[in-house]
A protein has these predicted regions:
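Dynamic "connector" segments at or just before major functional cores
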Residues: 1-69, 79, 100-113, 123-126, ...
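A short, flexible helix-boundary coil/loop motif
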Residues: 1-47, 256, 260-290, 359-446
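Major-groove recognition helix of helix-turn-helix-like DNA-binding domains
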Residues: 80-98
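Active-site-proximal, Lys/Arg-enriched surface segment
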Residues: 92-175
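An internal, acidic/charged active-site-proximal segment
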Residues: 185-297
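Extended, non-catalytic structural segments that build the interaction scaffolds
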Residues: 299-321
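Short amphipathic alpha-helical "interface-anchor" segments enriched in bulky aromatics
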Residues: 313-341
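Basic, amphipathic alpha-helical segments enriched in Lys/Arg and hydrophobic/aromatic residues
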Residues: 341-366
Length: 446
């Protein structure tokens, strides 16, 4: 998949949407078929066609299967004709298929989701020229056949003792569209647990820009593991990439030069200080101090973004929690708690299929709501009630909630009810009316 000036170049293959199955699965996988038309790594494979491979891998990420053999014996026959065990596991190690999978998810994130889904940050002033992402690392259990690599050192322990190393990945979440992207697989061969900043420094700047148009700025919101003032300066100066984080617990902040900010603006409710660090970093670093009116807890944020209101800075970091909800969904809804295979390619394949499955589910949930009027209305109502209760309690204490905290009430993840319904009905040859009936009932009663 080629990006030229921010546009994808279509590859000269015949249209393949006719190969899609009928029923719900056709609508669910249609974005994949559309993206395949732009896939440079696409090939005509007589054993496992690329479309079948992509549908099968996405289905495995959605399904609660405990192993590849379990998947082959139960789920895969719904997707395509039965595959040989060795053929499937060899395909998991294919660098070409991994490249194609990345291209497909890239197209779905950068084109389909940006076109179809509403902009969740549209109501925040000052962000018109920014793409905003939350990023973090996520770890799960090693593969069954992973060799013991790490050394468990420490006082009183055998320094030659070999241990299994957990599988780690670094992901990003587009806060405008909820698109999930896989940034990198963490180094397991030389490190027991690679630090987030070590992974970030390995990434090409184009990966961090995520296809942003020339002249457009990109914000990454990270926990304290993403702090490096020197690296922040390099990314900002060379690629227009900005970072927002919270100070590390051992970080001493004594000298701050105050910056002017509008204390009457409802956006800045809760802000106690906005200033520049004047000692330590060579590059300008901004400090925002915020106290949550609901809990009374004080938070400090550091960033190299200088042109956003301090209340916007606080709200953006609050939204970083959305990526933690994605990780919770990986673990407790998709049940992806263990690596599929031992090779680096296969582990990256799994992570990208987890992203693609999540993104397709987000698109499909939106489509069903828009075209059929089916949504999780009871949960939306409960969310609004919780927010109204919080607002009332704060006002009773003589305070007020920040305006952005009141208006940006949104779902942060796809519900487990929808995931269960999707997996149950995805491959059934049933009508939309028959398939949506149990979803309506689930939303209303469960």
């Amino acid at each position: 998949m080629t990006l030229t000036g921010g546009a994808f170049r279509k590859i000269g293959f015949m249209p393949i949407d006719a190969k899609l199955p009928q029923g719900l699965s056709r609508s669910f996988f249609l974005p994949v078929a559309e993206a395949l038309g732009f896939g440079e790594s696409r090939r005509k494979c007589p054993v496992i066609e690329d479309l079948d491979w992509l549908m099968a891998g996405t289905t495995r990420a959605l399904a609660s299967v405990v192993s590849g053999r379990h998947f082959l014996q139960t789920i895969v026959e719904e997707v395509a004709s039965a595959w040989e065990r060795t053929t499937y596991f060899e395909a998991l190690k294919s660098k070409r298929r991994l490249d194609l999978l990345r291209e497909i998810n890239e197209f779905v994130c950068r084109v389909t989701m940006r076109t179809v889904l509403p902009d969740r940050l549209a109501g925040i002033p000052g962000l018109e020229n920014y793409d905003v992402y939350a990023g973090d690392g996520h770890w799960h259990e090693h593969a069954t056949h992973d060799p013991r690599r790490g050394r468990k050192g420490g006082k009183g322990e055998d320094k030659n003792h070999r241990i299994h190393v957990a599988t780690g990945h670094v992901f990003g979440l587009n806060l405008r569209t909820r698109a999930v992207v896989h940034l990198a697989h963490c180094d397991e061969k030389t490190k027991i647990k690679e630090h987030d900043m070590g992974v970030l420094k390995r990434l090409d700047r184009d990966v961090l820009r995520q296809g942003a148009a020339k002249g457009r700025k990109v914000i990454w919101i990270w926990d304290p593991a993403g702090i490096s003032y020197t690296q922040w300066y390099k990314w900002k100066a060379s690629a227009g990439i900005y970072f927002l984080s919270r100070p590390k617990t051992n970080m001493i902040i004594n000298h701050v030069a105050d910056r002017p900010w509008d204390k009457a603006d409802p956006i800045n409710v809760g802000v106690e200080r906005d200033g520049l660090l004047t000692e330590g970093p060579q590059t300008p670093i901004r400090l925002v101090v915020f106290r949550d009116p609901a809990t009374g807890k004080q938070y400090k944020f550091i960033t190299n973004i200088m042109d956003l209101a301090p209340g916007v800075i606080a709200q953006l970091y609050r939204m970083r929690w959305d990526i933690e909800k994605i990780f919770d969904s990986f673990k407790n809804k998709l049940m992806e708690t263990k690596a599929w295979a031992k090779t680096t390619v296969a582990k990256s394949m799994q992570a990208n299929f987890m992203c693609l499955a999540t993104n397709l589910a987000t698109l499909f949930e939106h489509q069903i709501e828009q075209e059929h009027g089916v949504s999780n209305a009871p949960e939306t109502k409960r969310r609004a009630q919780r927010r109204e209760k919080e607002k009332t309690e704060v006002e009773e204490n003589g305070k007020e909630l920040p305006i952005l905290h009141q208006t940006l009430v949104r779902a942060t993840q796809t519900s487990v009810k929808f995931i269960r319904w999707l997996l149950c009905h995805l491959w059934k040859p049933t009508s939309w009316e028959a398939a949506l009936k149990p979803l309506r009932r689930s939303y209303a009663t469960l």
